[in-house]
Amino acid sequence: KSKMFRLLQGDVGSGKTIVSLITALNVIDSDFQVALLAPTEILAKQHYNLAKELFPKNISIELLSSKSENIDKKRIILSLKNNKTQMVFGTHAIFQKKIIFSNLGYIIIDEQHKFGVRQRKLLSDKGGNNCDVLLMSATPIPRTLTMSVYGDMDISVIKEKPSYRKEVKTYSKLESKIDDVLSFVKKEIKEGNQIFWVCPLIEESKKIDHQSSVNKYKFLVKLFPNKVGLLHGKIDSEEKEKILNKFLNKQFSILVSTTIIEVGIDFPNANVIIIENANK
């Protein structure tokens, strides 16, 4: 059989994860192990929970990350080696030398642009020469770039979204209409919804007249005490994950962020995104 090396492209919410899990079931049914790699623990955990919900109960799956308890890590490492675990969901922890698979046949890498070629090879080597690889990305890649950078892989594109997806409504407001926007935000919070508020800069700049996330955070905290969080590139990855987890668990209603905001993570209660200086 020929080895699969495929990129699956599709917009956020188009169903890439479901497609990958269906293909994983086929591989498991053929007595091979599967590894799904995600860049953050929060995303790996969401994929793991979805699989637990969808997979038959007799399929053994595990979640492995750098934050896993040592006793759990030892158990998972042993079960992968002994072919007791059929699919593992994890972060960079899966790259470790001590992670040895009994019969790895399929690797799924979500948000593939977050991982380097060497990292992908490290994981692929754990499955031998015939290990299939599926990369997933929500980032549209121009055809010419695809041919030059990804010329050695097949490409599949999900062009349609599930029929139940509601239409996204987009509105444009002048800066002078901020009171209208705030009234709308207040109404959404009252209804139990959450809001992403995206700014192009972290801090105020004398050279560029754009909104900064820090200033917007200070402004919104006064209006919505204890309901606003802040996320930007100067925050370390561990703290960033804590903030995203708090937002996911509805500990606050508005997340002010720069464009580093994660794609792929499912925030079921966040149905509004406000983008300052959208032209940037």
Named regions from a protein language model:
Residues 1-280:
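Inter-lobe coupling/hinge segments of SF2-like helicase ATPases
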